[in-house]
């Protein structure tokens, strides 16, 4: 009977065949231990010399790392294993023998591993990170579908940009200039006027020359837009969404979190409502903490965000940033028109901003004024202005960076490990 490592628990004391790769092995004169993986998990295969044909044991000792195999044997309980079971191997069939696999069990430098990213993905920890990424995506769809959102797919090639063109990749669209999208927001706002609540999930591109552990050139973003929704209501949706995702990973990725040695007690504390601190109060807090490199009207850097998040040791909303450091489409704060109705959600443990969101300007005259103030081409935004001409309503939206969120939840140090094939300032291969 053919099965998988994940399903093998349903076949205790039965003989099964599993297609797998050999990740590692060790042997003595009488027994060989094969570390097997098949994409669904990792399992140990035990080959006892006295219980198999001589050729099988010889093969078990000689087979090379990352060779592909069909392994047949009996599934037995093993309380020492993370899985709780292992295979007593009876026969081995080699599908393809691997020669001189470059990523050996010894330590390798990061650049070497990134050069071999197509192979590094096979390692136990990288496999665990990708499984957590997959669970975050699954939980995202679950949350939005249950909450009545409609999925919309905005274009990747665009003629205009929600935040200006200075950090966009320019390309040719036949005889026109086009940009790789940095956000689907403007299109989602249009879709929200048709469907009420919408979300998207797709790649975004930022031509930022950043080399920090938080930045990728290409990353995936989950964006939501909600009609008839105010800023406070939007924050509630955001914190409910993040809490749902964290709980889903805790429930469905226990083994992966253990492999990554993640301190799950920090994740277990994540619950609504999240703390909120205004930009004004955050400035005062930072100055009291000894930060003399930040003044009102300046954006926060990584050390500032980390200090604020560490104070709460939870995801925290920083609200109502100054108008002059935020994009043109954000609604003024009626209590202080030098600020806007926006919030950044800062993850704890130094992972930085994972969500940016705001209430959107819904008044046509004000939006036209903002477009001019930011030096944007009004014609390029004519469709966006139309949304305020024909039945404008209060509405809000937000975007969550998938890779940063996965980095925080999984506890990995650098965001590059949370994308299958990350695009960095100095890396376009593989």
Curated annotation (Swiss-Prot):
Q: What Gene Ontology cellular component terms go with this record?
A: cytoplasm
- Protein's recorded name: Asparagine--tRNA ligase
- Write out the GO biological process terms: asparaginyl-tRNA aminoacylation
Q: Which UniProt keywords apply?
A: Aminoacyl-tRNA synthetase, ATP-binding, Cytoplasm, Ligase, Nucleotide-binding, Protein biosynthesis
Top-level taxon in the UniProt lineage:
Bacteria
Leading EC class: ligase
Describe the protein's quaternary organization and the partners it interacts with.
Homodimer.
Q: A Pfam family in this protein?
A: tRNA-synt_2
Keyword field contains Protein biosynthesis: yes
Does the record's keyword annotation contain Iron-sulfur?
Answer: no
* Location(s), subcellular: Cytoplasm
Q: Where does the protein principally reside?
A: cytoplasm
InterPro entries hit by this protein: Aa-tRNA-synt_II, aa-tRNA-synth_II, aa-tRNA-synth_II/BPL/LPL, Asn-tRNA-ligase, Asp/Asn-tRNA-synth_IIb, NA-bd_OB-fold, NA-bd_OB_tRNA
Catalytic function, reaction form? tRNA(Asn) + L-asparagine + ATP = L-asparaginyl-tRNA(Asn) + AMP + diphosphate + H(+)
**Homology family:** Belongs to the class-II aminoacyl-tRNA synthetase family.
Recorded GO terms, molecular function?
Answer: asparagine-tRNA ligase activity; ATP binding; catalytic activity, acting on a protein; nucleic acid binding; transferase activity
Q: What is its EC number?
A: 6.1.1.22
């Amino acid at each position: 009977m053919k099965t998988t490592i994940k399903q093998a628990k349903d076949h205790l004391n039965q003989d099964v065949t599993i297609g797998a790769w050999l990740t590692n092995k060790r042997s003595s004169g009488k027994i060989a231990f094969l570390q097997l993986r098949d994409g669904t998990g990792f399992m140990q295969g035990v080959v006892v010399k006295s219980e198999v044909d001589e050729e099988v044991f010889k093969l078990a000792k000689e087979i090379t790392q990352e060779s592909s195999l069909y392994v047949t044997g009996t599934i037995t309980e093993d309380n020492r294993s993370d899985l709780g079971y292992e295979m007593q191997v009876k026969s081995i069939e080699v599908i393809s023998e691997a020669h001189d696999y470059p990523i050996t069990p010894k330590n390798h430098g990061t650049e070497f591993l990134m050069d071999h990213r197509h192979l590094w993905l096979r390692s136990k920890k990288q496999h665990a990170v990708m499984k957590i990424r997959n669970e975050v995506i699954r939980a995202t769809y679950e949350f939005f579908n249950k909450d009545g959102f409609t999925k919309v797919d905005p274009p990747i090639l665009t003629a205009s940009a929600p935040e200006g063109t200075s950090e966009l990749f320019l390309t040719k669209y036949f005889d026109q200039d086009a940009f790789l999208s940095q956000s689907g927001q403007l299109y989602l706002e249009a879709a929200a006027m048709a469907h009420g609540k919408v979300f998207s999930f797709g790649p975004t591109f930022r031509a930022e020359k950043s080399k920090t552990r938080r930045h990728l050139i290409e990353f995936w973003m989950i964006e939501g837009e909600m009609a008839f929704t105010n800023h406070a209501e939007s924050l509630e949706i955001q914190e409910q969404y993040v809490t749902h995702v964290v709980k889903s990973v805790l429930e469905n990725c226990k083994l992966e979190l253990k492999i990554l040695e993640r301190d799950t007690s920090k994740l277990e504390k994540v619950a609504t409502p999240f703390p909120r601190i205004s930009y004004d109060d955050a400035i005062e807090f930072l100055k009291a903490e000894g930060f003399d490199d930040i003044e009102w009207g300046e954006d926060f850097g990584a050390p500032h965000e980390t200090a604020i998040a560490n104070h709460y040791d939870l995801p925290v909303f920083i609200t109502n940033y100054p108008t002059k450091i935020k994009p043109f489409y954000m609604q003024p704060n009626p209590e202080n028109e030098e600020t806007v109705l926006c919030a950044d959600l800062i993850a704890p443990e130094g992972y930085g901003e994972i969500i940016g969101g705001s209430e959107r300007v819904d008044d046509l005259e004000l939006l036209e004024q903002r477009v001019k103030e930011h030096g944007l081409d009004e014609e390029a935004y004519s469709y966006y202005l139309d949304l305020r001409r024909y039945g404008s309503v209060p509405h809000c939206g937000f975007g969550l960076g998938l890779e940063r969120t996965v980095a925080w939840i999984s506890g990995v140090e650098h965001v590059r490990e949370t994308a299958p094939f990350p695009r960095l300032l100095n890396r376009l291969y593989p």
